[in-house]
């Protein structure tokens, strides 16, 4: 059977070979979640662009002795250390958060999600955000109608 597909210039699983199967499985999982089926999917790492755009805060003497502590390693801030600031405004040691964001795309404290390079996961993120916005508009409307 594979000779038939090779003769036509196609792989039996698609142009990307076995990767097509994995991509399609993930797409089906996302569609299932969008349709209300409760399931877990693997969360990809944060995109390289999102990581590069994180602002850096270098600790100076006046910052020391404050309440700033890296929530990943639990070490207090010291002069000369570099902290990265996530869009949610939480700060972490540069080394700690870069290692964290290579495993997942969310803040260790509040789970704010940074963008990823995975188009299927990004579609799910947009869907979740649209649903949250829809619920907020619905609640606002109901509050205005029924006080």
Swiss-Prot record:
One of its GO terms (biological process) is protein ubiquitination. SMART domains: RING (SM00184). Its EC number is 2.3.2.27. Pfam families: zf-RING_2. A zinc finger (RING-type) spans 70-111. The keyword Zinc-finger applies. Belongs to the RNF181 family. This is E3 ubiquitin-protein ligase RNF181 homolog. It comes from Drosophila melanogaster (Fruit fly).
